[in-house]
């Protein structure tokens, strides 16, 4: 409770190599990953998107188009699917990845700094609220229900068939 005259010396030492490894995104292996042709969906999030020509276009046995038309339409389907997909990913992939990153960062921040502290606070306060609610129920609602029950228990009905 007295006046403190001591000085507090605090030093923070940080290794530059350890700091750079853990705080930044490592882009060193991205070019190798893109060139290696590795599996870009290792958890099979989009395994249901196996869309081929036969999944979309099918001719029954009784009605077949000319073979050249079938071959050309199959080739046109595959080429257009490939070109349009490449064009759309070129146009939309980076903005959508940025938007998804911002969304997930926002949701993570809200979950960590707002939702979980609120839930923990509610769980901390809940036993007190439960005790108060039980007291109110025992003091007000239970006697009221008991007296209403006693009043209606003395009522008797007799039905006669005339």
From Swiss-Prot:
It comes from the Eukaryota. GO terms for cellular component: caveola; cytoplasmic vesicle; Golgi apparatus; Golgi membrane; nucleus; perinuclear region of cytoplasm; plasma membrane raft. The modification Phosphoserine is found at residues 20, 23, 36. It is found in: Nucleus; Cytoplasm; Golgi apparatus membrane; Cell membrane. The modification Phosphotyrosine is found at residue 19. GO terms for biological process: caveola assembly; cell differentiation; endoplasmic reticulum organization; insulin receptor signaling pathway; mitochondrion organization; negative regulation of endothelial cell proliferation; positive regulation of dopamine receptor signaling pathway; regulation of cytosolic calcium ion concentration. Residues 87-107 dip into the membrane without crossing it. It is a peripheral membrane protein. Its main location: nucleus. Residues 1-86, 108-162 are cytoplasmic. GO terms for molecular function: D1 dopamine receptor binding; molecular adaptor activity; protein kinase binding. PROSITE patterns: CAVEOLIN (PS01210). Phosphorylated on serine and tyrosine residues. CAV1 promotes phosphorylation on Ser-23 which then targets the complex to the plasma membrane, lipid rafts and caveolae. Phosphorylation on Ser-36 appears to modulate mitosis in endothelial cells. Phosphorylation on Tyr-19 is required for insulin-induced phosphorylation of MAPK1 and DNA binding of STAT3. Tyrosine phosphorylation is induced by both EGF and insulin. Signal peptide: none annotated. Belongs to the caveolin family. This is Caveolin-2. The lineage of its organism: Eukaryota, Metazoa, Chordata, Craniata, Vertebrata. The gene is CAV2.
């Amino acid at each position: 409770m007295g006046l403190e005259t001591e000085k507090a010396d605090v030093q923070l030492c940080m290794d530059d190599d350890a700091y750079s490894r853990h705080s930044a995104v490592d882009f060193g292996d991205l070019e190798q990953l893109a060139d290696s042709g590795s599996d870009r969906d290792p958890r099979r999030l989009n395994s249901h998107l196996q869309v081929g020509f036969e999944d979309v276009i099918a001719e029954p046995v009784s009605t077949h188009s000319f073979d050249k038309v079938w071959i050309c339409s199959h080739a046109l389907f595959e080429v257009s699917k490939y070109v349009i997909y490449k064009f759309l990913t070129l146009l939309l992939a980076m903005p959508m990845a940025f938007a998804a990153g911002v969304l997930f960062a926002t949701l993570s921040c809200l979950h960590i700094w707002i939702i979980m502290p609120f839930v923990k606070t509610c769980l901390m306060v809940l036993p007190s609220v439960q005790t108060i609610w039980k007291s109110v129920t025992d003091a007000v609602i239970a006697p009221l229900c008991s007296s209403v029950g006693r009043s209606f228990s003395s009522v008797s009905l007799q039905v006669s068939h005339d």
